[in-house]
Curated annotation (Swiss-Prot):
The keyword Transmembrane applies. This is UPF0295 protein BcerKBAB4_0454. GO terms for cellular component: plasma membrane. It is a multi-pass membrane protein. It comes from Bacillus mycoides (strain KBAB4). Belongs to the UPF0295 family.
Length: 118
């Protein structure tokens, strides 16, 4: 069983979702410090800022998602969005590329870096 690839857009969305839960957890920890109003307020504000940060990340990936190329995955025949030179299908995690020079090569995220020359 090889390496499991994941779509970049899904990775960023997962990060934003985790920020929501982490923020809520941090804010909830503030309840345990009810005696000290400064510590309680600090925990709640940090948690609130994490939730706001997740909103910013969701907004950013939504705007980025509108500019991506939509293709049909050759494996599952479902439409998927591609970000960069190489990416994975959102549905079946099939490695995909639009660069003819990279066809047949092993999937690697380094192909998306500007410093990489094919």
């Amino acid at each position: 069983m090889g390496i499991k690839y994941s779509n970049k857009i899904n990775k960023i969305r997962t990060f934003a979702l985790s920020l929501v839960f982490i923020g809520l957890f941090i804010a909830y920890l503030g309840v345990f410090f009810r005696e000290n109003i400064i510590i309680m307020t600090t925990f709640m504000m940090v948690g609130f800022l994490a939730v706001i940060a997740s909103t910013v990340v969701y907004f950013w990936i939504g705007m980025l998602s509108t500019k991506t190329i939509q293709i049909i995955c050759p494996s599952c025949d479902k439409p998927t969005k591609m970000l960069g030179r190489v990416d994975a299908c959102m549905h079946c995690n099939q490695p995909l590329t639009l660069d003819r020079n990279l066809e047949g090569k092993e999937f690697d995220e380094k192909y998306n870096k500007k410093s990489y020359k094919s």
